[in-house]
Amino acid sequence: MANKKLAFQDIILTLQGFWSKQGANLMQAYDNEVGAGTMSPYTFLRSNGPEPWGAAYVQPSRRPADGRYGENPNRLFQHHQFQVVLKPSPKNIQELYLQSLAELGIDALEHDIRFVEDNWENPSMGCAGIGWEVWIDGQECTQFTYFQQVGGIEVDSVTSEITYGLERIATVIQEVDSVYDLEWGNGVAYGDIFKEPEYEHSKFAFEESNQELLLKLFGEYEQEALDLLDKGLVHPAYDYILKSSHTFNLLDARGAVSVTERAGYMHRVRTMARKVAKTFIEERAKLGFPLLKDEALREKYLGKKGKYTKIVEGEEK
């Protein structure tokens, strides 16, 4: 690889090129506020059910409580994740990940790369899995997970998720201490694009957000999501679940909910997440699981009545 250090946008292009060759569909960032790439429907919804799936995409991820007014060198209201989800998981997925780092110029012989066991979960969305944090030269840069549950439902097929923290990967590659000193591309600094929005979003989240409005919106988003799910409209419903989740995160950052109330809000989001995951599988079953090419397996999962049948250790459930 050339000595010139990759700009932020070139890191994205390199990862897109690498993972598309491994069978991942290159998706675009989902156009709704999410706290992580996992919450995109390209991961959350598609990880359940028997259909194979592969996707890779950049996802801007908003975490209001992590805002630091643009003053912290690596903690942000909004950061960027490069998300890879492969179902079923390739047996050599860890090897592929290391190859992707090599494509970025991060040689395992020249850098300290460690897989630190870290079983991951997202309680509010009912997601959990076994996996590792990947540390490069002393900082966490990637989360590597084999999903066990999504939306509170046990997955049918082992699904692997790789979440690159792009800002942290970029600081390793460009050898800078602050994300704001990164080159985004064409000589433009990361800070020239994102430092002002970081300050403004932090000020909004911690000082200026309208708590009464947010409380009202959460309830309205929740009701709309549940109404849409009753009508079998999975994707519009999921949009409102994401809005509910982000609204809760804004309330939490503002200190507008107590510890007890916080648990209650998380339970409400988790209830919606479980319902949308279940409904998504049911709707895909009505279509005959079109991405499932194995006819015998399709028939097994659809059962005798053409409805989704959970398979557990070779038996129907």
UniProtKB/Swiss-Prot annotation:
Designated gene of the protein: glyQ
EC number: 6.1.1.14
Reactions the enzyme catalyzes: tRNA(Gly) + glycine + ATP = glycyl-tRNA(Gly) + AMP + diphosphate
UniProt keyword annotations, A-Z: Aminoacyl-tRNA synthetase, ATP-binding, Cytoplasm, Ligase, Nucleotide-binding, Protein biosynthesis
Subcellular location(s) of the protein: Cytoplasm
Pfam (any one): tRNA-synt_2e
Protein's name in the database: Glycine--tRNA ligase alpha subunit
SUPFAM superfamilies: Class II aaRS and biotin synthetases (SSF55681)
Entry similarity comment: Belongs to the class-II aminoacyl-tRNA synthetase family.
Single annotated GO MF: glycine-tRNA ligase activity
